[in-house]
């Protein structure tokens, strides 16, 4: 029987975007990607008005930091790409 890992470190990231459509686009890009260490990180993504909201539960403070840093790197790339494509 597998042992249940406790995920005591929780963080919510609420990202304001220009519109609900932009928030939904970010969600669509991020949603298919699974966490690399699913046993150590749980993620819940959803849109609230023009906000992308991401809830994380992680096994350690270090894992929380690494996970949130990765989210911000991905969001930077997604938003920059959306901006570039909107100017075409």
From Swiss-Prot:
InterPro entries reported in the protein's UniProt record: CTAG/Pcc1 (IPR015419)
Keyword field: Activator, Chromosome, Cytoplasm, Nucleus, Telomere, Transcription, Transcription regulation, tRNA processing
CC per GO annotation: chromosome, telomeric region; cytosol; EKC/KEOPS complex; nucleus
Recorded superkingdom: Eukaryota
GO annotation, biological process: tRNA threonylcarbamoyladenosine metabolic process; tRNA threonylcarbamoyladenosine modification
Xref: Gene3D superfamilies: Alpha-D-phosphohexomutase, C-terminal domain
Location within or outside the cell: Cytoplasm; Nucleus; Chromosome, Telomere
Keyword flag Nucleus: yes
Predominant location category: cytoplasm
Physiological role: Component of the EKC/KEOPS complex that is required for the formation of a threonylcarbamoyl group on adenosine at position 37 (t(6)A37) in tRNAs that read codons beginning with adenine. The complex is probably involved in the transfer of the threonylcarbamoyl moiety of threonylcarbamoyl-AMP (TC-AMP) to the N6 group of A37. SPAC4H3.13/PCC1 functions as a dimerization module for the complex. The EKC/KEOPS complex also promotes both telomere uncapping and telomere elongation. The complex is required for efficient recruitment of transcriptional coactivators.
Family: Belongs to the CTAG/PCC1 family.
Subunit structure: Component of the EKC/KEOPS complex composed of at least of SPAP27G11.07c/BUD32, cgi121, gon7, pgp2 and SPAC4H3.13/PCC1; the whole complex dimerizes.
Protein name (database record): EKC/KEOPS complex subunit SPAC4H3.13
